[in-house]
């Protein structure tokens, strides 16, 4: 259930914006996810985010923890993740992942606020 040996280089090139690598990385991710690994390697979610498939990345992330939450949350959502935080699917992600409930008790991060409808809206 591990990623194949070519994954690190392909994923790194994808994260750096290589369009050709992105196509290969997405195909590799599709194959990897078809095997239903548990837990999912966190880099897979990050690659989906950087490949523009934010809804799919958030859906995977909200269903179960990855093997590396700090990578996905730190680098994916908070560091350079404005397009992820502002995606329409982000509010559902915060609810289903438990972040919204945690923020209700502890307060949201600086980039987020609770909207009138109860959803968290982030910049």
Regions found by a protein language model. Give the residues of each.
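Alpha-helical protein-protein interaction modules
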Residues: 1-123
